[in-house]
Amino acid sequence: MRLPGAMPALALKGELLLLSLLLLLEPQISQGLVVTPPGPELVLNVSSTFVLTCSGSAPVVWERMSQEPPQEMAKAQDGTFSSVLTLTNLTGLDTGEYFCTHNDSRGLETDERKRLYIFVPDPTVGFLPNDAEELFIFLTEITEITIPCRVTDPQLVVTLHEKKGDVALPVPYDHQRGFSGIFEDRSYICKTTIGDREVDSDAYYVYRLQVSSINVSVNAVQTVVRQGENITLMCIVIGNEVVNFEWTYPRKESGRLVEPVTDFLLDMPYHIRSILHIPSAELEDSGTYTCNVTESVNDHQDEKAINITVVESGYVRLLGEVGTLQFAELHRSRTLQVVFEAYPPPTVLWFKDNRTLGDSSAGEIALSTRNVSETRYVSELTLVRVKVAEAGHYTMRAFHEDAEVQLSFQLQINVPVRVLELSESHPDSGEQTVRCRGRGMPQPNIIWSACRDLKRCPRELPPTLLGNSSEEESQLETNVTYWEEEQEFEVVSTLRLQHVDRPLSVRCTLRNAVGQDTQEVIVVPHSLPFKVVVISAILALVVLTIISLIILIMLWQKKPRYEIRWKVIESVSSDGHEYIYVDPMQLPYDSTWELPRDQLVLGRTLGSGAFGQVVEATAHGLSHSQATMKVAVKMLKSTARSSEKQALMSELKIMSHLGPHLNVVNLLGACTKGGPIYIITEYCRYGDLVDYLHRNKHTFLQHHSDKRRPPSAELYSNALPVGLPLPSHVSLTGESDGGYMDMSKDESVDYVPMLDMKGDVKYADIESSNYMAPYDNYVPSAPERTCRATLINESPVLSYMDLVGFSYQVANGMEFLASKNCVHRDLAARNVLICEGKLVKICDFGLARDIMRDSNYISKGSTFLPLKWMAPESIFNSLYTTLSDVWSFGILLWEIFTLGGTPYPELPMNEQFYNAIKRGYRMAQPAHASDEIYEIMQKCWEEKFEIRPPFSQLVLLLERLLGEGYKKKYQQVDEEFLRSDHPAILRSQARLPGFHGLRSPLDTSSVLYTAVQPNEGDNDYIIPLPDPKPEVADEGPLEGSPSLASSTLNEVNTSSTISCDSPLEPQDEPEPEPQLELQVEPEPELEQLPDSGCPAPRAEAEDSFL
């Protein structure tokens, strides 16, 4: 009910008098409480004054929020007690519960209470304030709770919302209590409208506590402490959020309390720790320390105890017994062990013959002391490959400031017995004497035995022991000597035999506790000549020599010979099952490629293999626009056979036959007259693709791990991202040159000896390329400078688009080789070189690599094959086609998008690998490869090679994944290459003067499918393999490929020059990179590279550098 609010003072005073009079006159009817006005709910006006009266048969009192506000208590004459509570100047904060209860318990029900709820609508107070405890509601199970957002006006409409939501929740509301229901672990607020103003309550947090069975663990920093040191114990509870710790300890029983500290382990959820720290421990603090943990919700409890020992001072005590005499066997490792207890941790020293031992004896002595428990230690002295000189008196001493103990023993070195001499002599007395001399430690015993039937002895007939017996007519004489320096015994025994009438096998056996040794000698009668023994020995040596020569000849014949991997297909049989390859020696060689030797200045060795080497050189007069040009020169070693010289000449003819292409290491010239054959090619200073990916992996990972990278970061930016350090191209070995590796450690790494020269070749210490410098720090020398238009990408950061670009460029180069009917047969990332501006070139690096020591090449018969990169038909049927190169291209893609990983890392190179390939096993998607890239890999790895996509289709598939900026830049570089006076372009134009303009796309219908013609020359080039037309997968309309432009020559020749080594300058046309979710995989092992001028290719190819 609503009562009038403010009343005049006189009226209030009169009312109080009247009320008191009524109370005095009213008879005592019951002992119950009477509240005036009766309630149970009142609505009062703000700023008004109101009186509440409570009466009863015992003293009564008004309570408000568990407190007794100021009130007037009285007792009437009839024994009735009353309490008057006057509320003045009411505000909204006076809203709430008021209780009237008895003030004592004189036989009355102590729990009898009268409740009255008063509302004071106050526009300035929307919601009643709550204590901090009321804002956090904790639950241990799913149950109904109340969110106490109470208002001062019962007429207000109140709604409940999640803290970050606008939708009202359908929960019943009580103006006196709040919202009641089952709530989730969320944050909630209440809203109401007062006038035209929306009012929000404080946020209420509902939180469900983790309550489970208590699991307590107690540990101490040290269970043994000295008097005066600190005792620190930790009690940890797992699986609960609110628990109570109670410690019991010896000091507590004597009334000396220690306040423990409780904290939460933030890095381990639901882990609470209580720490008991007792400073300056006394002897009385020894005893049991117990941690009792209780949880009040489910009344769970658990306790653990630990014993603490306080000692007056430290101690060292030996455990167990160690004999005073120890043994060690010569040349065997021996570990001497001493176990002891100590506190505090002691210092341990070992002595030999009163000299301190250490770990500095070249690895022959190892000392170690380890702590096996808190106070238990094991000290070990390990003698590695024991020597006689290590015998002696040893002492172990353990000590600290409070105590000391030592243990001594004698070490005896046991030496296995060995027969040093067994000889026979014929004294003049007619008897025959056999003398046996041997040594060992401990003292050896000597046993003589003999066997008369040489054919059946000793396997069928046991030897007869000899001694002082009349039957054998033999006598023994034995002398024993101890050698102090060697610390071993020497035994000399002489056996005297009488009347030896036929050959006799005499055996001398020495035996001691370590082992035994035996030698035999044939004692022959005096009449038998000793020349028989000498002749037998000579014949045996002759036989061994002949067998050794045969083995060496067989090994020499099986030694792999250098052969070029690239093959050019001439024709295919009508049934498509036989291929005839072009005999490279029948190809013409144009003298246009010839370069005078005096225009070539050779420098340091870049790479060296089993058959040849590649050196850095400076060529003069190759280009009109450049007086000098840095080049790579391939040559054979002086030990090369004629077949290998023929193979190198065949490689030269194939390269000149193929012609130039932007993504192939191009032939620049050759020296074939007046000395060894030199093949001069382009010089790629950043080395092979595998090494490049390894050295720049950190820039890729940093670049893509930053999720906050601004979208304005672009593909062709010349600046590093903010906060990204300059790339640190780490060299993996001591020396490196130009990105090429010296594959033979015993070869010279300085300068190439000019063999068979006429004196017309110049030598120079060519300045090594600074391959370790980042892109933006590299300043090329004059011969290397080129225009900025020839750079595809200048960014020093390795990006995802770079990986796609590398794949695209390799596909372009392989498309060119396929158009020339050329099969690569060793396509891998190690045979792809990186030039300036992230331009890649396909090569064959076998000449400068020792394939017999390269783990990527597996011996199969008399050759070494890169099995992990080979297609199934190549492995099992020796079938090589351009479509088997497509399989290898898929493996190369996997290498690129694993940042230089080794294929099939989970498969050993044994029968398991072959079985997995036969079953159709394929590698999983690399972490950095998109689904589109992995789909291309899977197409390349089709079991049936007929349905693998040709390289022309792979170019189009990869082109779709590139940005327009990249494609335009690549086309610009390609066109610039064709218009330049690059030596490969000029010499090809001179060789084909009538060939101008762009070549039309390859018409595969007229290539490779002619009838087989008889070939009397080289049957070695015929490999039976089917190579029908590939079935092109059904793809959508594809854009034209720009790669064909690189396979043609343009008659327009400008003054610009293309070089693989070029300075880097900013570019204007950026391309945004795709967003990647980067997953870092374990980094594969990197091979070591020699330090040189530029990154070295990995030693992983079989054949030619080109």
Swiss-Prot record:
EC number: 2.7.10.1
Cytoplasmic side: 554-1106
Residues recorded with modification Phosphotyrosine: 562, 579, 581, 686, 716, 740, 751, 763, 771, 775, 778, 857, 934, 970, 1009, 1021
Stated consequence of mutating residue 666 to S: In PENTT; likely pathogenic; gain-of-function variant resulting in constitutive autophosphorylation and increased phosphorylation of downstream signaling proteins; levels of protein phosphorylation are similar at 32 and 37 degrees Celsius
Main location (coarse class): membrane
Signal peptide: 1-32
Classification via Pfam families: ig, Ig_3, Ig_PDGFR_d4, PK_Tyr_Ser-Thr
UniProt-annotated glycosylation sites, renumbered to this chain: 45, 89, 103, 215, 230, 292, 307, 354, 371, 468, 479
Processing after translation: Autophosphorylated on tyrosine residues upon ligand binding. Autophosphorylation occurs in trans, i.e. one subunit of the dimeric receptor phosphorylates tyrosine residues on the other subunit. Phosphorylation at Tyr-579, and to a lesser degree, at Tyr-581, is important for interaction with SRC family kinases. Phosphorylation at Tyr-740 and Tyr-751 is important for interaction with PIK3R1. Phosphorylation at Tyr-751 is important for interaction with NCK1. Phosphorylation at Tyr-771 and Tyr-857 is important for interaction with RASA1/GAP. N-glycosylated.
Marked site: Breakpoint for translocation to form the CEP85L-PDGFRB fusion protein: 558-559
Name the UniProt record assigns to this protein: Platelet-derived growth factor receptor beta
Organism whose genome encodes this protein: Homo sapiens (Human)
